[in-house]
Curated annotation (Swiss-Prot):
Annotated protein name in UniProt: Myosin-1
Modified positions (Phosphotyrosine) in chain numbering: 389, 424, 1467, 1495
UniProt record similarity statement: Belongs to the TRAFAC class myosin-kinesin ATPase superfamily. Myosin family.
Subunit structure: Muscle myosin is a hexameric protein that consists of 2 heavy chain subunits (MHC), 2 alkali light chain subunits (MLC) and 2 regulatory light chain subunits (MLC-2). Interacts with SLC26A5.
Domain IQ: from-to ranges: 788-817
Phosphothreonine PTM sites in chain numbering: 64, 69, 419, 1258, 1268, 1289, 1470, 1504, 1520, 1733, 1739
């Protein structure tokens, strides 16, 4: 997410693209409850926000935002996303992906005027219905070069991504913009074109000038100006949109190799030409009509002979005539200027306006019916005169052609009469055809003008097409549009799946192959496949008597009940009738087929078309000529259903042309990288900011946004990098990732997710990311929020405690300081009046003044000497530095020179090798191109030879026709027709010669452009396209020739020509397969060469690795030597510390001497002499100390010299290594060797870097030690400045020098940081090189895979070719047979041969289709070969890039060596400065000896305080250890206690539930009432017999299941412990009451256990495995708990060792002790409360008796409920698991209770002692009470024994019932399996029957068709036979006449 500073570049558009950081943070911090915040289904709003109040039985009660409470089902509730996802820019990242989340995200962003939002691959845009400042030049500049995730969503971001992908990936791009009318498709298309026109010319100082007289503007202006012209003629007002595009368009913008604009072209689809003659009330026709009548240009009004009132013209005034939001006058000027900019001539401009005016006049033409006839005649000629004048036609001819058109019947033309309605229909069709053809011609002219003939490399296509349409009345237009969207959605699904598949494959995720593109295949095949809707429609158009009803019947017969996507619509009141329904992906659409046959045929008045072709207006004549039709087919203009016309004699329907253009569009899209934009209408009223939920949801479904989300949810939509996941979610379980050791982010993420309680099937681990299913990330976020809340609360508590303790510590220190001051003041007040003290006060200053003067003089002399020495040392150091710098510079220059020479030599060799390779490749390509050109020339020669043969055959046909001319009169007419068609053929052959000439020109162009490989590939693609077009034309011409020969009924020539055509196609296919085979062999040879080179590279890599190992050994030796030097330095440092210690001892002795002097006061002369001796000794010791320091300095100097020598040796060795590296670089031949060498060098550098870092750390430690010493010395000097004023300036100089040292240290640290950054940069580059290498290897592997695919395809082609040859030979044999039959009996069998000819023609057509399929496969193989060549070129470019990167790395390595030398130089400088500072410190340390008086008292006091502090610290540490152990134990006890209490509560709840359910079950068992009546009287015997029964059960369970042993043993032990405790406590009343309470509680527990065991014993065998697994799980959990406890123990030990303040920990422990004592008191109170429970004994007994009575009452009703016991027994199996868990809890409770019992035993002993003192009376009373209680216990035991006996009987009964239920269940399962098998068989039989019925229907249809054809053939044969008989009679009569005359 960008910051506010980064968003500033967007200017005023920033708030409309992304909200500020403050607003985002406020929105995300809103209160949110993930469990209660939901969306619920609402009847009005579709979905509303709500808060869950309760969930019961699959129903959810929620309170909506409006305050209403609703109850809905679970599946109507959708969870809400956390606030962090509010207004999210990419909806695919939401953790909960569903319809309401998408809807409300769009709504909230739209309310904030952020109209663009991503949804995975989609960019969704909502129409704002107002102007927003988000398209200005500032925004264009801000989006340029930005990645998608770096900027807010925008159409400019999509455009720039397409542009950048085109430049980087060298692949054509496309932007698919879809949506309903009024959604903003056209506006976004304009913005895309504006963006490309802006950025593609940025940087050009001079714009392109006009290259001819036609161009009136630059290419950018023309591209932008194409929109106003197309909008004027193609846009209109609709109900939803004032400027709705009524056609689809695909704009291709071509770019050159550098990314500059080269040219553009436009393809149009589905123009709504019906709007020319008809509009709804709320709509109007195309804008151009109203622009012309706006009277902005009066000369147009005069020229077109029209008025300014639209109501004068019927075609344009059926709806509204004005639009408030459009100024027609301004739009007219924009259209007129666009015509100028686009280079239309003045004649063309006038023609455009005149034809538009003629269309308006057509609507006013009137016709009437003749009297007593149905014939129409003109009702006035004024309007017709105007229309004819505007079109340069004769008015009378026009009217005659309309009323009396000439129709061709056979080979004759007849005049046909027209009714009035037929004339009006013809006029409307002509008006629509003129307008449509003019529009398509304008598109063709625009394309010609935008084609600048500049070299173009790639293109970006922008598709602006209508979205899915579901209206009340849906016709053929809606079917075409919906079918287009279906194909586009399939294309998107497949593309999205491929991207997801690549992502999963790249990340190594196991993913099942699901091609979502196949989801829509059923609907698409239903429409376009053979016998589909389009196929049936075209078939019906072939029959003259076909109607809409017959078309509907055929649809029903073919598809109703056989395809799930084809349905019969349900009749709806108030709606137009629908004939069939199709289930599209966006919904079910009802279609009305009225008029589909006429729409598909698209008939025109051929007589009027002939007039148009002869018009003197060139534009009109061109529109209706054959060239225009060809231009339509090439430009794609007509785009489908509107512009189809007949070409030659072929018959092409609107649907066929639409499918052809759609297939071209899909081919274009598949060859590009697509980008998807979906436009949304927010409301129907065009209100800004308002959003209608149902409308938006409908569009999201239709646009495929929700479909994309469905696909996304199938996989893993949420994905996070491992490092980000570890950083964000580590807080969930920090203990899962061990501290203090390195662990990979991926392993850490795996451990973290494995330790969290989530569904582990909902995520997968990739190579770099972790993938999550939808919804899991939201759960993790919720868990993280809860954890953070706990941590923050705990942190706040710790911080508050810490602050309180700090404040308390300050108070304690303040108190101690006050006590110290008070003590000293009192002592001073006591001694200040002593006489000796007064004398001391007077003498003490005098002694100090004399001493200070001497010391000052000595210090001055020493300072001067030190200054001189420092100056000399500085001078020497500077000289040495200058010399060293000069030497290092020379050394670096030499290294750089040698390195540059080696690099230049290596680069030259590599360039030479590369040029040789490219030359060889180019020569091979040129050779291939020339060979292909020669092959094409041979093919063309063969075609010309065939043409000659055809001409010869035509001459033979002429002779045959001359012979037949004597007998048949009609044959003469057919002959003339044949001659005309032959002339047409010769003209087409001339066109073929022109195409051959074009091919030769292209060959020359290819030979000239061989040096540029990319241009060569482009030319080859153009050549292939032209060849395929020529081939299509040739095939069409051959088809025309076949038609003419069919009319002449010459079957033999048809068959021979078809044979030759098949032979030619086969030869072409063979040659293409040979070319593919040659290419494959070349690729195999290249692969073998590459593999050989890779093996050589591998061997060289191994050699260099061995050399790298040797270098690493040398470096390790050098590192060992450096470590030895460091050890010597450490020894020197230790000796220096020893000397310092001696100095301190001497100073301490001096201080003791001075103390004695001060105590003596006025000493004798002997003492003074003694003091002088001591001073002399002190001076001698000082001199000795100085000599020792000098010796240490000398040794340090020698060590430094050794270190410098070792550094020099290292430098020499580095130079040697450099020379060796250069030699190795010369031997490098491929990129992989350089990368490996760099890797080895990087390892060496990293190790040397580590050594240098160690040295730097040691130096930093020394600097820090010196710094601390300097600071201490500076502090002492500052204290003496008050007494030494003259030395103040000198101390200032010292402090300044210390600041300089600090700055030097900071400089060193900064240098170190820069050094580390450079090394990290080198590592990053090395990783990039490794990634590039892996990418190359992957590309090589993919190319091998492609070669394998090509080989397989070639084998398939060979098999197909063999099949074709067999078919051809069979056809040839049949042709020979038919030829012999024809020659023997040609006249009699004419009709039969016609039938055979049709069959053969059908078979030939099938063979041709097969050959076309083979050619298509060959073309696909050629494309794959070209793609492989492109990939090879890409690999070569990648190799060049990696070579350049290696050179850059070499340069960086040299820079690194230079930086290393500078670092060493800085190190020596700092070392010298450190030595100087050490000298200064030694000089300052001599002064410390003179500062005795002020230092003595503080030193003594400090020593005493230290000793005391040390003792205290030792005591405190001992106490803290003890306290910590005690606290830990108390803490553990507290945790155990809490856990036990929690388990106790859970156990009690579970036991209560189990008791209630089991009591309910007891009432249902048969015959239990007899046994339970004795429970009251025999409860004493029940306890004893229960003991025996438990023992028996224990033995049984040991044999049956070992897992139940633990529970039974626990119960037996608890009971035995209770009995033992009861016997021990017989002597005391309190003890007996406690035991009685315990025994009663145990009796109740025994009763409950008896009921529990009743359920346990029922399904023991079934749950044996579950119990074992549960035991193993418990063991694993115990082991995990022990491990965690060990980890916690280790952490506690570490924390204890790292405590910084012992006082704080001691107080914490004291506080914890207090807390523990309070908890102990709480435990005592709980124990007392347990003792008080004895008073409730009598009440408990009465409650038990009442319960027994209830049980007896329930037993009386048991017979009625006994039948339900079988079903309820299954429920008890589920409770077994619960009881197993409770048994474990009971075990833990028992141990705790044993501890409490021991405590109580201790207290009872004390009470017993008290009781003995109480007296005999009290004892007697107690004994009596005990006996009473014992009697009661015995009675209870007896009753218990009786209950256990009854229990055994019931258990046997329960076992019998369980066995019976098990048998019944097995029988039911067997019956269910049998039923399922029978149902599956029935379904299979039904499916087979349906298939057989379908096949029979197909066969029946074929049979009927063949029977119909047979009947027609028989009729024709009868007619022919009768004619033959007549001719025979005539010939005989003629013969007889001749004989008679003779």
């Amino acid at each position: 997410m960008s910051s506010d500073a980064e968003m500033a570049v967007f200017g005023e558009a920033a708030p409309y693209l992304r909200k500020s950081e403050k607003e985002r943070i406020e929105a995300q911090n809103k209160p949110f409850d993930a469990k209660s915040s939901v969306f619920v289904v609402d009847a009005k709003e579709s979905f509303v926000k709500a808060t869950v109040q309760s969930r019961e039985g699959g129903k959810v009660t929620a309170k909506t935002e409006g305050g209403t409470t609703v109850t809905v089902k679970d599946d109507q509730v959708y969870p809400m996303n956390p606030p962090k996802y509010d207004k999210i820019e990419d909806m695919a990242m939401m953790t909960h992906l569903h319809e309401p989340a998408v809807l409300y995200n769009l709504k909230e962003r739209y309310a904030a005027w952020m109209i663009y939002t991503y949804s995975g691959l989609f960019c969704v845009t909502v129409n704002p219905y107002k102007w927003l400042p988000v398209y200005n030049a500032e925004v264009v500049a801000a989006y340029r070069g930005k990645k998608r995730q770096e900027a807010p969503p925008h159409i400019f971001s999509i455009s720039d991504n397409a542009y950048q992908f085109m430049l980087t990936d060298r692949e054509n791009q496309s932007i698919l913009i879809t949506g309903e009318s009024g959604a903003g498709k056209t506006v976004n298309t304009k913005r895309v074109i504006q963006y490309f026109a802006t950025i593609a010319v940025t940087g050009e100082k001079k714009k392109e000038e006009a290259t001819s007289g036609k161009m009136q503007g630059t290419l950018e202006d023309q591209i932008i100006s194409a929109n106003p012209l197309l909008e004027a003629f193609g846009n209109a007002k609709t109900v939803r949109n004032d400027n709705s595009s009524r056609f689809g368009k695909f704009i291709r913008i071509h770019f050159g190799t550098t990314g500059k604009l080269a040219s553009a072209d436009i393809e149009t689809y589905l123009l709504e030409k019906s709007r020319v003659t008809f509009q709804l009330k709320a709509e109007r026709s195309y804008h151009i009509f109203y622009q012309i009548m706006s009277n902005k240009k009066p000369d147009l009004i005069e020229m077109l002979l029209i008025t300014t009132n639209p109501y004068d013209y019927a075609f344009v005034s059926q709806g509204e005539i004005t639009v408030p939001s459009i100024d027609d006058q301004e739009e007219l000027m924009a259209t007129d200027s666009a015509i100028d900019i686009l280079g239309f001539t003045s004649d063309e401009r006038v023609s455009i306006y005149k034809l538009t005016g003629a269309v308006m006049h057509y609507g006013n033409m009137k016709f009437k019916q003749k009297q007593r006839e149905e014939q129409a005649e003109p009702d006035g000629t004024e309007v017709a005169d105007k229309a004819a004048y505007l079109q340069n036609l004769n008015s009378a001819d026009l009217l005659k052609a309309l009323c009396y058109p000439r129709v061709k019947v056979g080979n004759e033309y007849v005049t046909k009469g027209q009714t009035v309605q037929q004339v009006y229909n013809s006029v409307g069709a002509l008006a629509k055809a003129v307008y449509e053809k003019m529009f398509l011609w304008m598109v063709t002219r625009i394309n010609q003008q935008l084609d600048t003939k500049q070299p173009r490399q790639y293109f970006i296509g922008v598709l602006d097409i209508a979205g899915f349409e579901i209206f009340d009345f849906n016709s053929l237009e809606q079917l075409c549009i919906n079918f287009t969207n279906e194909k586009l959605q399939q294309f998107f699904n497949h593309h999205m799946f491929v991207l997801e598949q690549e992502e999963y494959k790249k990340e190594g995720i196991e993913w099942e192959f699901i091609d979502f593109g196949m989801d829509l295949a059923a609907c698409i095949e239903l429409i376009e496949k053979p016998m589909g809707i389009f196929s049936i429609l075209e078939e019906e158009c072939m029959f003259p008597k076909a109607t809409d009803t017959s078309f509907k019947n055929k649809l029903y017969e073919q598809h109703l009940g056989k395809s799930n996507n084809f349905q019969k619509p349900k009749p709806a009141k108030g709606k137009v009738e629908a004939h069939f329904s199709l289930v599209h992906y966006a919904g079910t659409v009802d279609y009305n087929i009225a008029g589909w046959l006429d729409k598909n045929k698209d008939p025109l008045n051929e007589t009027v078309v002939g007039l148009y072709q002869k018009s003197s207006m060139k534009t009109l004549a061109y529109l209706f000529s054959g060239a225009a039709a060809a231009a339509e087919a090439e430009s794609g203009g007509g785009g489908g259903k509107k512009g189809a016309k007949k070409k030659g004699s072929s018959f092409q329907t609107v649907s066929a042309l639409f499918r052809e253009n759609l297939n071209k569009l899909m081919t274009n899209l598949r060859s590009t990288h697509p980008h998807f934009v979906r436009c949304i209408i927010p409301n129907e009223t065009k209100t800004p900011g308002a959003m209608e939920h149902e409308l938006v949801l409908h569009q999201l479904r239709c646009n495929g946004v929700l479909e994309g989300i469905r696909i996304c949810r199938k996989g893993f939509p949420s994905r996070i990098l491992y490092a980000d996941f570890k950083q964000r979610y580590k807080v969930l379980n920090a203990s899962a990732i061990p501290e203090g050791q390195f662990i990979d982010s991926k392993k850490a993420s795996e451990k973290l997710l494995g330790s969290i309680d989530i569904d582990h099937t909902q995520y997968k681990f990739g190579h770099t990311k972790v993938f999550f299913k939808a919804g899991l990330l939201g759960l993790l976020e919720e868990m993280r929020d809860d954890k953070l809340a706990q941590l923050i609360t705990r942190t706040q508590a710790m911080c508050r405690g810490y602050l309180a303790r700090v404040e308390y510590q300050k108070m304690v220190e303040r108190r101690e300081s006050i006590f110290c001051i008070q003590y000293n003041v009192r002592a001073f007040m006591n001694v200040k009046h002593w006489p000796w003290m007064k004398l001391y006060f007077k003498i003490k200053p005098l002694l100090k003044s004399a001493e200070t003067e001497k010391e000052m003089a000595n210090m001055k002399e020493e300072f001067e000497k030190a200054k001189e020495n420092l100056a000399k040392a500085e001078a020497k150091r500077k000289e040495l530095e200058e010399k060293m710098v000069a030497l290092m510079q020379e050394k670096n220059d030499l290294q750089l020179q040698v390195q540059s020479e080696a690099d230049s030599l290596a680069d030259a060799e590599e360039r030479c090798d590369q040029l040789i390779k490219t030359k060889i490749q180019l020569e091979a390509k040129i050779k291939e191109v020339t060979e292909r050109a020669e092959d094409e020339e041979e093919i063309n020669a063969e075609l010309t030879a065939k043409k000659r043969k055809l001409e010869d055959e035509c001459s033979e046909l002429k002779k045959d026709i001359d012979d037949l001319e004597l007998t048949l009169a009609k044959v003469e007419k057919e002959k003339h027709a044949t001659e005309n068609k032959v002339k047409n053929l010769t003209e087409e052959m001339a066109g073929l010669d022109e195409t051959i000439a074009k091919l030769t020109k292209e060959k020359k162009a290819l030979q000239e452009a061989h040096q540029q490989t990319l241009d060569d590939l482009q030319a080859e693609e153009d050549k292939v396209n032209t060849l395929t077009k020529a081939k299509i034309k040739l095939e069409q011409q051959v088809d025309d020739l076949e038609g003419s020969l069919e009319q002449e009924k010459k079957i033999r020539m048809d068959l021979e020509r078809a044979k030759r055509k098949l032979e030619g196609d086969l030869k072409l296919a063979q040659e293409s397969t040979m070319d593919v085979e040659n290419d494959k062999q070349q690729l195999d040879e290249k692969l073998k060469k590459k593999e050989f080179e890779m093996s050589n590279l591998q061997s060289k890599i191994e050699d260099e690795q061995a050399l790298g190992m040797q270098l690493q050994k040398k470096i390790k030796e050098l590192q060992a030597r450096i470590e030895e030097l460091e050890e010597e330095i450490e020894a020197e440092r230790a000796s220096r510390a020893k000397a310092e210690k001696q100095r301190s001892d001497l100073s301490r002795e001096l201080e003791e001497i001075s103390e004695r002097l001060e105590e003596a006061g006025g000493a004798t002369s002997a003492q003074i002499e003694m003091n002088k001796k001591r001073e002399a000794e002190f001076q001698k010791m000082r001199r000795d100390l100085e000599e020792a320091t000098l010796q240490h300095e000398a040794t340090a100097a020698t060590l430094r010299k050794k270190h410098a020598d070792s550094v020099a040796e290292l430098g020499e060795q580095i130079d040697n290594l450099q020379r060796v590296k250069q030699k190795l670089e010369k031997e490098k031949s491929e990129m992989k060797m350089e990368i490996d060498d760099l890797a080895s060098n990087m390892e060496v550098i990293s190790k040397s870097k580590g050594n240098l870092e160690k040295m730097c750390r040691t130096l930093e430690d020394q600097v820090s030690e010196l710094k601390t010493k300097e600071e201490e010395q500076q502090r002492l000097i500052n204290e003496l400045t008050a007494q030494r004023g003259r030395l103040q300036t000198e101390s200032g100089e010292y402090s300044r020098q210390l600041d300089e040292k600090d700055s030097l240290v900071s400089q060193l640290s900064r240098g170190k940081q820069a050094f580390t950054q450079q090394i990290e940069e080198l590592k990053r580059q090395l990783e990039e090189e490794i990634k590039a290498k892996s990418a190359l290897a992957h590309a090589l592997q993919s190319s091998r895979h492609d070669c394998d695919l090509l080989r397989e395809q070639y084998e398939e082609e060979q098999e197909a070719k063999a099949e074709l040859q067999r078919a051809m030979s069979k056809a040839n044999s049949e042709v020979a047979q038919w030829r012999t039959k024809y020659e023997t009996d040609a006249i009699q069998r004419t009709e039969e041969l016609e039938e055979a000819k049709k069959k053969l023609a059908q078979r030939l057509q099938d063979a041709e289709e097969h050959v076309e399929a083979v050619n298509a496969k060959c073309a696909s193989l050629e494309k794959t070969k070209q793609r492989l060549q492109n990939e090879v070129e890409d690999l070569m470019i990648d190799v060049e890039r990696t070579n350049a990167a290696c050179a850059a790395l070499d340069k960086k390595q040299r820079n690194f060596d230079k930086i290393l030398a500078e670092w060493k130089q800085k190190y020596e400088e700092t070392h010298a400065e450190l030595e100087a500072s050490q000298k200064e410190s030694r000089s300052l340390s001599t002064e410390l000896f003179k500062i005795k008086n002020a230092y003595e008292e503080s030193l003594d006091h400090l020593e005493t305080l230290k000793r005391e502090n040390k003792n205290l610290q030792q005591e405190i540490s001992d106490l803290t250890e003890q306290i910590a152990e005690g606290g830990k134990r108390i803490h553990e006890l507290e945790k155990i206690k809490k856990q036990i209490e929690q388990e106790k509560s859970e156990l009690q709840a579970a036991l209560e539930e189990a008791e209630a359910s089991l009591e309910h079950e007891e009432g249902k068992i048969l015959r239990i009432q007899l046994e339970l009546n004795q429970v009251k009287s025999e409860i004493d015997r029940k306890i004893a017999e229960k003991d025996e029964e438990i023992d028996q059960l224990k033995r049984n369970h040991i044999r049956v299941v070992e897992s139940m042993q633990s529970t039974l043993d626990a119960e037996i032990r608890s009971r035995n412990d209770a009995i033992r405790l009861k016997k021990k406590m017989e002597g005391d009343l309190n003890e007996m009451e406690i035991q009685l309470n315990h025994s009663n509680r145990m009796a109740a527990e025994a009763l409950r256990n008896y009921r529990n065991t009743q359920g346990i014993l029922k399904d023991t065998q079934l749950h044996l495995d579950d119990a074992l697994r549960g035991q193993e799980d418990l063991k694993e959990q115990l082991a995990m708990v022990e491990r965690r406890a060990n980890l916690l123990q280790a952490e506690i030990e570490e924390l204890r060792a790292t405590l910084e303040q012992t006082e704080r920990s001691r107080k914490i422990a004291e506080q914890e002790l207090l807390d523990a004592s309070e908890r102990v008191q709480l435990l005592h109170t709980q124990n007392t409360s347990l003792i008080n429970t004895k008073k409730k004994l009598e009440t408990d007994i009465s409650q038990i008796q009442g319960e027994m009575e209830d049980i007896v009452q329930e037993a009386r009703n048991a017979e009625e409920k006994a039948k339900k016991a079988i079903t309820d027994a299954a429920m008890m199996a589920e409770e077994l698991k619960k009881e197993q868990d409770t048994s474990a809890h009971l075990e833990r409770m028992k141990k705790n209770l044993e501890q409490t019992v021991k405590d109580l035993q201790h207290r009872l002993d004390e009470a017993e002692q008290l009781a003995l003192k109480g007296g005999k009376k009290q004892i007697q009373k107690l004994e009596a009470r005990v006996r009473e209680l014992e009697g009661e216990v015995e009675n209870e035991q007896k009753r218990n024994v009786e209950a256990i006996k009854g229990l055994r009987k019931h258990e046997r009964r329960v076992k019998e019932l369980t066995y019976q239920t098990e048998e019944d269940r097995k029988n039911v399962l067997r019956l269910q399996d049998l039923v399922d098998k029978l149902q599956s068989k029935v379904k299979a039989y039904k499916r087979q029957a349906e298939e057989a019925e379908e096949q029979s229907n197909v066969n029946l249809a074929k049979f009927r068709k063949i029977q119909h054809e047979l009947e027609e053939a028989e009729e024709r044969a009868d007619i022919a036979e009768s004619q033959v008989n007549k001719l025979r009679v005539k010939s005989r009569e003629v013969h007889t006449k001749i004989i008679s005359e003779e």
